[in-house]
């Protein structure tokens, strides 16, 4: 499962939308940064530098709105000069899914320390969420850039005759297809080795939440601590 840092201009709006996009794409969200999260600039930079995520999702601003806050976040990312968790020979991917008027400013602020990918604004208006393009870009980059650095993955690609999907994306698609085919609301739980994922489709809207520290192998000690030996 890919690990991500997400950032948005406003904690209760674009940052939450970015988190939903990342979770829906199958990621573990390591932290959520926002311009109004109470952290000082140097604290934000230290946090970004210390996390070593697989990629970063940056959002902020409705289309045509202010560009200041999201550019400030981009400058913090650039100052942190983050390194990816896997692989030393490529730059960390950053997906920008914010105010379209800020694209050039964000690109200039990030500079050459990261590889920037631009997709549609995930919050084009205050009332509208548009999570699909960001989710798809996260999944594509995970397979193309992150998994390509994983030991043995190139050999696996040679063996496989079909496209390889991350488990959360595959389970999420299954839940969506069941809900659509049966015209019902659907809830599914996937208990994995390191994480437990809950998928839902209600009124046609797909969501995924993840507990990143509860699972049946790598994280089983956390389950024991939560439940007790009895």
Q: Where are the model-predicted features located?
A:
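Nucleotide/phosphate-binding catalytic cleft detector across ATP-hydrolyzing
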Residues: 1-185
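Glycine-rich phosphate-binding loop of actin/hexokinase-like ATP-binding domains
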Residues: 176-230
